[in-house]
Amino acid sequence: MNARVWSNPLRDPRDRRLPQIAGPSGLVIFGVTGDLSRKKLMPAVYDLANRGLLPPGFSLVGFARRDWEDQDFAQVVHDAVREHARTPFREEVWQQLAEGMRFIPGDFDDDTAFKQLRDAVEELNASRGTGGNFAFYLSVPPKFFPKVTEQLKKHGLAKAPEGSWRRAVIEKPFGHDLASARELNAIVHDVFEPDQVFRIDHYLGKETVQNILALRFANQLFEPIWNRSYVDHVQITMAEDIGIGGRAGYYDGIGSARDVIQNHLLQLMALTAMEEPASFDADSLLTEKLKVLRAVKLPAELGEHTVRGQYAAGWQGGEKVRGYLEEDGIPASSTTDTYAAVRLNVDNRRWAGVPFYLRTGKRLGRRVTEIAVVFQRAPHSPFDSTATEELGENAIVIRVQPDEGVTVRFGSKVPGTSMEIRDVSMDFAYGESFTESSPEAYERLILDVLLGDANLFPRHQEVEESWKILDPIEEYWATHGRPAPYPSGTWGPEEADEMLARDGRSWRRP
């Protein structure tokens, strides 16, 4: 049963320069009272409407344990939009959007609530022309996925009417190891077909992450040297300057490696290392990313080539901050990692012998995410060693956040009568090169869900391959001591510097 694809007969479907507009549809958000919904999802929906990318009859349904009427829910969305939306508030856009808002109060095991949800969907089909097309956004902890999907199936909400579609959107974490990820996938796929399931990794919605593919495959400049013959190593960093905040209950059972490396960083690595896809579609991208993940080889000595850390008290932004073990809700015996660094190799012809260093952490020097492709030094130099002693390694650095852009670092002669060569940088910054403002990641991802475009969503195979990489590291850490402490505001434990020093390298200072 194929869902009818909404298309403009006057437009070439291959022309992707103009944004596509979603066809008749609605979005149901479970867990609509949470931070993610309030700060990201609701503002993204409004911003899409404000840009004219949602259909006039678009509908938004909230489901949560609150004794609210539809107008109470609309007020909550209104406040969230006013506070967090990227685009200016326009009353006429808001009024049209608000007319399609409905709220269903109830628990996930409440049959009456799901009957109300089914009735609301049918009413919106009739009053707003949503055409039976609905996406169900599970903005809830994974432990609730089985119950929510079971209820959707039980009440006929997962099955689309003839010519319509139903889709499920789920947020990370996609399990906490390979076994739980497989169990989760089986539960979701029992109700929805794999191509109906959209797993959100918001990093893949960021402009600079998508630009990795453009940078590599739309230019002749970079790809010929994007291999082991020229690249010395690759560093992928996601650093945060904040602590865990109020997320102790969630974070203490997970840690930084499971929270970030398993999804964001391995996805960035796959995009950096993959071969050119046959075309820019979801299946072709999946094929090439899977090849990379399946070629990843763990170091033989995990103790030497992986490091975990835990932030201690220190100074951050001019303020004294607590260590992880002093945070509210964290037991003094916790061995949860707030910093993780690993060395991985991609065992194929392009990358054999090139290490990929992945690191992430909280309470580090600054908030930054970047991919640095660091090149080998020139095999021969005609200059005296004194002329090049301040020359570092050439690098292409893709800045994912903040200050999105690309930096190319190379050596140049210092003005003067002598020959002295130092590092200089050429910078491309999104904010300076384009007048268009970049949409938030969730804008792009929600629109893609409504369009059925799965290019930017990890499939279940990628999730499982990522856990196969991380699980042996987590198992090793579980039986080998405690995380190394590092003062807040620094760049992680000394052991991480020593890990690279053993390879004759050092971490970049972003």
Where would I find each of the regions flagged by the language model?
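Secretory/organelle targeting and membrane-embedding segments
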Residues: M1-I170, F174-P510
